[in-house]
């Protein structure tokens, strides 16, 4: 068939000729830029299933819509002081390490507590840590780690502490307008493509600042300009709701509200209210109980909780205590919840650090019904005092001064 000319570009008059022209263009592109530079979506492994790193909180996994933090993407966690931002990031590090991943922590604030990280389940002896002097150094280290292709998760704590070299070399009181914003914008442009190829999850922790002269609307904003807002696939806001205590007792935790402000992987603006226990992080058993009730795997009638028609406790604290004391049943419930929420994901328990030798391959039918009844009776008569979470700390860790690997 004949072709009409539009300038110097031939316009094909049939579908077959268009496809031939497109194939010739594809071959030329691949010759110039390499194999896989142009492909059809859904073919030639152009798009694979989204790989994730669980958050350590099954309720937050559900709110994110895909079961955790997506690999190969940039995540921003922000909020007021002492709201739980670093706790969220350390839980993600622990979950990545459980799955055999390599984690790095860029401590720009020079404030990471190894003991607290250990208590949250982080293998401190396997964690790579850097405490850079300048923001440029921190971001160059992050880029080098991403380019290596060997690191699964990197945490930068925090954006506000990425002090530009010009500011460090200057005097106190000197005005340095927009230096962090320019630094972040340049770094993120370089990092975006290599992060996706390396399947590394890069988490930026950020602080809040107040805008000057704002009369209407929310005066709060995050540091580092707006580049991070654009490049982040997921933005998570963490805020403290209340301090957890009973009467005159000493406070033992915080209740926090986690809101998904931006989500390119699933619908955004979902909210989760959860507990963070001092020195222990997420109340994992409480989160599992709430998720199981929501998915109707555990039945709640009045104050009683029941699993497979067997009562496991009267009141929330007693039901949580039952889960802590019966890890076989806890893993059954966790498997059922995760299978229902994320059927395509392989099951790896978030509780394996509590009982490392436990086999995760046992079917739900293999649990001992007598154990269920016996432990349920204990749970029903247990005291209603607050149930403490089981510690995940390993007693055989080395001294803190020698465990962290310095870059």
Curated annotation (Swiss-Prot):
GO terms for cellular component: cytosol. SUPFAM superfamilies: P-loop containing nucleoside triphosphate hydrolases, RecA protein, C-terminal domain. PROSITE patterns: RECA_1 (PS00321), RECA_2 (PS50162), RECA_3 (PS50163). Keywords: ATP-binding, Cytoplasm, DNA damage, DNA recombination, DNA repair, DNA-binding, Nucleotide-binding, SOS response. ATP binds at residues 79-86. Its main location: cytoplasm. Residues 358-407 are annotated as: Disordered. Residues 377-386 have a biased composition (Low complexity). CDD domains: RecA. The keyword Transferase does not apply. Gene3D superfamilies: P-loop containing nucleotide triphosphate hydrolases. It is found in: Cytoplasm. It holds the Pfam family RecA. InterPro entries: AAA+_ATPase (IPR003593), DNA_recomb/repair_RecA (IPR013765), DNA_recomb/repair_RecA_CS (IPR020584), P-loop_NTPase (IPR027417), RecA-like_C (IPR049261), RecA-like_N (IPR049428), RecA_ATP-bd (IPR020588), RecA_C_sf (IPR023400). One of its GO terms (biological process) is DNA repair. The keyword Nucleotide-binding applies. GO terms for molecular function: ATP binding; ATP hydrolysis activity; ATP-dependent DNA damage sensor activity; damaged DNA binding; single-stranded DNA binding. Belongs to the RecA family. PANTHER family: MITOCHONDRIAL DNA REPAIR PROTEIN RECA HOMOLOG-RELATED, RECA. HAMAP family: RecA. Can catalyze the hydrolysis of ATP in the presence of single-stranded DNA, the ATP-dependent uptake of single-stranded DNA by duplex DNA, and the ATP-dependent hybridization of homologous single-stranded DNAs. It interacts with LexA causing its activation and leading to its autocatalytic cleavage. This is Protein RecA. The gene is recA.
């Amino acid at each position: 068939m004949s072709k009409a000319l539009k300038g110097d570009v031939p316009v094909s008059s049939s579908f077959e000729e268009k496809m031939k022209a497109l194939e010739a263009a594809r071959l030329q592109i691949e010759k110039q830029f390499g194999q896989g530079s142009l492909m059809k979506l859904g073919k030639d492994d152009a798009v694979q299933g989204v790989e994730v790193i669980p958050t350590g909180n099954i309720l937050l996994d559900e709110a994110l819509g895909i079961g955790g933090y997506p690999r190969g993407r940039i995540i921003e966690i922000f909020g007021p002081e002492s709201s739980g931002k670093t706790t969220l990031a350390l839980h993600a590090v622990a979950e990545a390490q459980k799955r055999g991943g390599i984690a790095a922590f860029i401590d720009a604030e020079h404030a990471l507590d190894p003991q607290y990280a250990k208590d949250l389940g982080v293998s401190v002896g396997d964690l790579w840590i850097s405490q850079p002097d300048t923001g440029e150094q921190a971001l160059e280290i992050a880029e080098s780690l991403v380019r290596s292709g060997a690191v699964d998760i990197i945490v930068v704590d925090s954006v506000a502490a990425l002090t530009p070299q010009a500011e460090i070399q200057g005097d106190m009181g000197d005005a340095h307008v927009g230096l962090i914003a320019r630094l972040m914008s340049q770094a993120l442009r370089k990092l975006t493509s290599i992060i996706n190829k390396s399947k590394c999850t890069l988490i930026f922790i950020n602080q809040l600042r107040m805008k000057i002269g704002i009369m209407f609307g929310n005066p709060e904003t995050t540091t580092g300009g707006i580049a991070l807002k654009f490049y982040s696939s997921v933005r998570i806001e963490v805020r403290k709701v209340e301090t957890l205590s009973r009467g005159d007792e000493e406070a033992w935790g915080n209740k926090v509200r986690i809101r998904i402000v931006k989500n390119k992987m699933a619908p955004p603006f979902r909210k989760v209210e959860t507990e963070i226990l001092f020195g222990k992080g997420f109340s994992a058993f409480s989160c599992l109980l709430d998720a199981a009730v929501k998915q109707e795997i555990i039945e709640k009638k009045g104050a009683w909780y029941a699993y497979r028609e067997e009562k496991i406790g009267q009141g929330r604290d007693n039901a949580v205590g039952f889960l802590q004391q019966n890890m076989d049943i806890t893993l059954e419930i966790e498997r059922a919840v995760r299978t229902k929420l994320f059927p395509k994901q392989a099951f790896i328990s978030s509780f394996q650090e509590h009982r490392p030798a436990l086999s995760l391959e046992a079917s739900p039918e293999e649990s001992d019904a007598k154990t269920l009844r016996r432990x349920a009776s204990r749970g029903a008569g247990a005291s209603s005092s607050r149930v403490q979470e089981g510690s995940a700390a390993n007693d055989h860790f080395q001294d803190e001064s020698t465990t962290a690997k310095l870059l």
